[in-house]
């Protein structure tokens, strides 16, 4: 006969698995918006070599989001890109 503890553990695991399968997943654009540097505009701008203007690009952590183009100075740092809209 199945013990009470075994039934409780199985129900708990079932709830965890069902809950994990139905978690909302963020889109890539939402993730990049969350990590966009917009606290101080003077620190979030970067030089985009395409047009040679200082501060014409915007620093994004990760890759450039959709609708943005990566500047020819592709990697701003090890973790960020210089992108322009």
Swiss-Prot record:
Gene Ontology molecular function: any one: toxin activity
Keyword terms: Disulfide bond, Signal, Toxin
Pfam family, one: Toxin_4
Highest taxon, organism lineage: Eukaryota
SUPFAM superfamilies: Defensin-like
Disulphide connectivity of cysteines: 46-82, 48-71, 64-83
Membrane spanning stretches: none
Extent of the signal sequence: 1-20
Function per UniProt: Probable toxin.
Name the UniProt record assigns to this protein: N.vectensis toxin 6
Record lineage: Eukaryota, Metazoa, Cnidaria, Anthozoa, Hexacorallia
């Amino acid at each position: 006969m199945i013990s009470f503890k075994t039934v409780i553990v199985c129900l708990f695991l079932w709830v965890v698995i069902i809950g994990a399968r139905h978690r909302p997943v963020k889109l890539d654009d939402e993730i990049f918006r969350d990590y966009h540097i917009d606290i101080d505009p003077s620190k979030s701008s970067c030089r985009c070599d395409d047009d040679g203007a200082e501060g014409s690009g915007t620093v994004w952590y990760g890759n450039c989001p959709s609708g943005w183009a990566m500047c020819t100075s592709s990697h701003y740092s090890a973790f960020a890109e210089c992108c322009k809209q």
